[in-house]
Amino acid sequence: DGKVILNDNGLPIRDNFQQNLGHTDPKWILGFQNSFKYKNMSLDIGIDGVWGGVMRSLTVEKMWWGGKHPYSTEFRDAEYAAGTPVYVPEGVNVVSGELVQDANGNVVSDNRVFKPNTTAVSWQTWSQNYPYRAQVTEAENKTFANVFDRSFFKLRSLVFKYDFTDLINIKGIKHFDMTFTGYNLLMWKEADIIDPDYGNDNNLQDPSTRYLGMGLNFK
């Protein structure tokens, strides 16, 4: 039923076979580039993005390991005050039976009987195991997820120019315009915390940088 299977110590049991969590390539790659002009004003706009696909975030995994994830302090103070583990992972323990799989990981038989887990574990131990060592999708557990939907749309570029030539009368200046430029201004994304613009996060990349600029052009 999708619950994590835990051992007697309350920690996840490693699957002997790898599972397919999705494709890293998106279903769609989209882009829009256009220019608009009205009298002395012009506007260039660029929007792009992808739809579908998944990405693993090594950054999120390392944040859990090092206690830097926004949720990584959730039970730490309570555990410190109690002097004993207080976090009881949501999952099940095997009471009896066994799972038999073939060489490809297909289930041959499964007569296991489960019970809800009641074992509390150290919050640090849990954080440095499940969300760090396992590949967790948002569908499996949104709090501990490190595999995300990489869909996003971004206002990649916006360039606004205004020509002041007709408004000024300065000797020696035949043309004068001002330009405002912006890159990576806005983003809609499915994933929290991370920047899916890179397509993967295996090298602990910094997120894309927002840039704002202004230029003056005299002739």
Tell me what each language-model feature is.
Residues L11-N20, E138-A145, P196-N200:
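Extracytoplasmic loops and strand-loop junctions of Gram-negative outer membrane beta-barrel proteins
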Residues W28, K39-M41, S151, G172-F176, ...:
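Outer-envelope beta-barrel architecture signal
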Residues W28-N34, L155-F160, R210-L216:
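Hydrophobic, lipid-facing positions within transmembrane beta-strands of outer-membrane proteins
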Residues K37, D48-V50, T181-L185, K219:
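Outer-membrane beta-barrel pore domains and translocons
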Residues N40-I45, L167-I168:
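Repeated loop/turn-to-beta-strand initiation elements of outer-membrane beta-barrel proteins
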Residues I45, M178-F180, L216:
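Membrane-embedded beta-strand positions of outer-membrane beta-barrel proteins
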Residues V50-G172:
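Extracytoplasmic gating/loop element in the C-terminal half of outer-membrane beta-barrel translocons
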Residues G67-T73, A78-P85, N104, E140, ...:
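C-terminal beta-signal and terminal closure region of outer-membrane beta-barrel proteins
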